[in-house]
Amino acid sequence: MHTAAQFSISTLNNLYEISSVEVGQHFYWQIGSFEVHAQVLITSWIVIAILLSLAVLATRDLQTIPTSGQNFVEYVLEFIRDLTRTQIGEEEYRPWVPFIGTMFLFIFVSNWSGALLPWRVLELPHGELAAPTNDINTTVALALLTSVAYFYAGLHKRGLNYFGKYIQPTPVLLPINILEDFTKPLSLSFRLFGNILADELVVAVLISLVPLVVPIPMMFLGLFTSAIQALIFATLAAAYIGESMEGHH
């Protein structure tokens, strides 16, 4: 009976710890009458600083015969270029390589920062820090950038004829075609946000149950999932841009 009671108490304690795992507490700056979402700004600036630092280090001493570090950077650039060319097409892809590359690298580093950097160790007066993509504001902003990009691409390539796609194959589908242009990138943002948030919550729950062993495989799985989510977002963003210039679904 004593052992059973101890087991029950231990189980209740574990359940209490799990119930205390929160979706996230945000850190805000109060500037006048405006409440600024500081958590996203701080972590986004850190991610941008990491990317800029890596870019400076990678291009500081370029060699005709590339070193191992230069080889890696060239491989990443070639990967992004091939991804963009595959989705947009041989003739139109070059101007869009920087945009797709920026999207991919920002999301990739943001996702990995959530898995590798101990954001929550940094104590704040209130709230907590987390990966930028762990916040719906960031992923929706990326979705809106994608929307602006493919609207611009379609109008730049096809002019006012771009709007003709909304009444194809029949004008009856006009509302659905308009709605589709906004739901496609938003679905990307919700998928990215949901996957990153779920990964962090699963790791937090497992750490509360088995602090040492079990979370490690989940963290490696989280790194893999984070990379896949960055690839999916960049690939579909490029596909939407290519689709807008081609003028068909």
Swiss-Prot record:
Gene3D superfamilies: ATP synthase, F0 complex, subunit A. Key component of the proton channel; it plays a direct role in the translocation of protons across the membrane. GO terms for cellular component: chloroplast thylakoid membrane; plasma membrane; proton-transporting ATP synthase complex. The keyword tRNA-binding does not apply. F-type ATPases have 2 components, CF(1) - the catalytic core - and CF(0) - the membrane proton channel. CF(1) has five subunits: alpha(3), beta(3), gamma(1), delta(1), epsilon(1). CF(0) has four main subunits: a, b, b' and c. It is a multi-pass membrane protein. GO terms for molecular function: proton-transporting ATP synthase activity, rotational mechanism. NCBIfam families: ATP_synt_6_or_A. This is ATP synthase subunit a, chloroplastic. InterPro entries: ATP_syn_F0_a_bact/chloroplast, ATP_synth_F0_asu, ATP_synth_F0_asu_AS, F0_ATP_A_sf.
